[in-house]
């Protein structure tokens, strides 16, 4: 049986063997608290590649040490971190998948002993520290850090990079009027609030020629915040700058109640795709092959990002293939165990 989920997908100069993406998920497992890769990361990502994921995306990786969520985050702020990341891409490639990395800065959500930085001195909630409002020099240094991180990503062998512009982290904080109260050229109008991301994309384009994704929070879930329609305009600007795909998540900009249900964020991928004609990724409580296949067949998204389901079962692609009646070729090492995987779901 033919399956769109298991059909190849080419984006720019990279061809994925299927449409399944391992969504970036922080593991907080840099054992030396120096941003370095550990054996856990090699096993964690290599296993999902062996499980037949098309694109394995490494978790949010900090472009500056002070931009980590925690001191156990992965980092890419120094050349000495390239070696471990290169081992990771080698594990991924050797097991048949393409490798991506999410470049990130936590902004006001950095939970370190040092200062947190943000576009404006507004804490996420009353339990978190008041961040330092970034001055122009700090903004420029952070933009340069993203560029250097992109170059290190190339040296480490990644095929795709994703800029983390979602979930209330630094880029998202500049985009949203809830967190950006600046009165200079980086605040105020949508064009000014987009300027930080615009300059990051421009700087990354100078050193990176592969596909670039951007993860967005397409809904602030706040009456004064951004909606998916605001992100239509942001996406049009990103598309003009050469961004290849928008990874459509939502929320976490400010504390808010979110009604979650299977596929609750697919609507955002569909809306962005329809109104901008850019490729999109759907993410959020997508847990079955039939659900993923329907999203693709309905032209609501181009790639399917799977998170927690891949934590529960690194061989999710095999289960999805069984469900869809698609014959997935297992790694040759596992050919002595043909047939269906049985689950208790």
Curated annotation (Swiss-Prot):
InterPro entries: Aldolase_TIM, NADPH_DH_bac, OxRdtase_FMN_N, YqjM-like. The keyword Oxidoreductase applies. FMN binds at residues 23-26, 60, 102, 215, 307-308. It is an enzyme of class 1 (oxidoreductase). Its EC number is 1.6.99.1. GO terms for biological process: response to toxic substance. Keywords: Detoxification, Flavoprotein, FMN, NADP, Oxidoreductase. SUPFAM superfamilies: FMN-linked oxidoreductases. It comes from the Bacteria. CDD domains: OYE_YqiM_FMN. Homotetramer. Catalyzes the reduction of the double bond of an array of alpha,beta-unsaturated aldehydes and ketones. It also reduces the nitro group of nitroester and nitroaromatic compounds. It could have a role in detoxification processes. This is NADPH dehydrogenase. It comes from Bacillus cereus (strain B4264). The gene is namA.
């Amino acid at each position: 049986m033919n399956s769109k989920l298991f059909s190849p997908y080419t984006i720019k100069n990279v061809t994925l063997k299927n449409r399944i993406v391992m969504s970036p998920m922080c593991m907080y497992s840099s054992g030396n608290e120096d941003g370095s890769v550990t054996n856990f990361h090699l096993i964690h990502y290599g296993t999902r590649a062996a499980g037949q994921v098309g694109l394995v995306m490494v978790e949010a990786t900090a472009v500056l040490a002070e931009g980590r969520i925690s001191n156990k985050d992965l980092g890419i702020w120094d050349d000495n971190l390239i070696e471990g990341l290169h081992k990771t891409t080698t594990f991924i490639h050797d097991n048949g998948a393409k490798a991506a990395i999410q470049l990130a800065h936590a902004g006001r959500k950095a939970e370190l002993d040092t200062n947190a930085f943000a576009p404006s001195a507004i804490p996420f909630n009353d339990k978190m520290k008041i961040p330092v409002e970034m001055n122009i020099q700090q903004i420029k240094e952070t933009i340069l850090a993203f560029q250097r991180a992109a170059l290190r990503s190339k040296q480490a062998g990644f095929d795709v990079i994703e800029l983390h512009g979602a979930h209330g982290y630094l880029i998202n904080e500049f985009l949203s009027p809830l967190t950006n109260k600046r009165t200079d050229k980086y605040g105020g109008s949508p064009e000014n609030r987009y300027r930080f991301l615009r300059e990051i994309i421009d700087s990354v384009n100078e050193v990176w020629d592969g596909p670039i994704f951007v993860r967005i929070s397409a809904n602030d879930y706040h009456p004064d915040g951004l909606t998916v329609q605001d992100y239509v305009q942001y996406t049009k600007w990103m598309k003009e700058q050469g961004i290849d795909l928008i990874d459509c998540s939502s929320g976490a900009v400010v504390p808010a109640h979110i009604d979650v249900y299977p596929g609750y964020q697919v609507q955002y991928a569909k809306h962005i795709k329809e109104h901008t004609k850019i490729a999109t990724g759907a993410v959020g409580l997508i847990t079955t092959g039939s659900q993923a296949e329907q999203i693709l067949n309905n032209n609501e998204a181009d790639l399917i990002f799977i998170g927690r389901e891949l934590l529960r079962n690194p061989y999710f692609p095999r289960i999805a293939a069984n469900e869809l009646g698609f014959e997935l070729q297992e790694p040759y090492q596992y050919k002595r165990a043909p047939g269906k995987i049985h689950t208790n779901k």
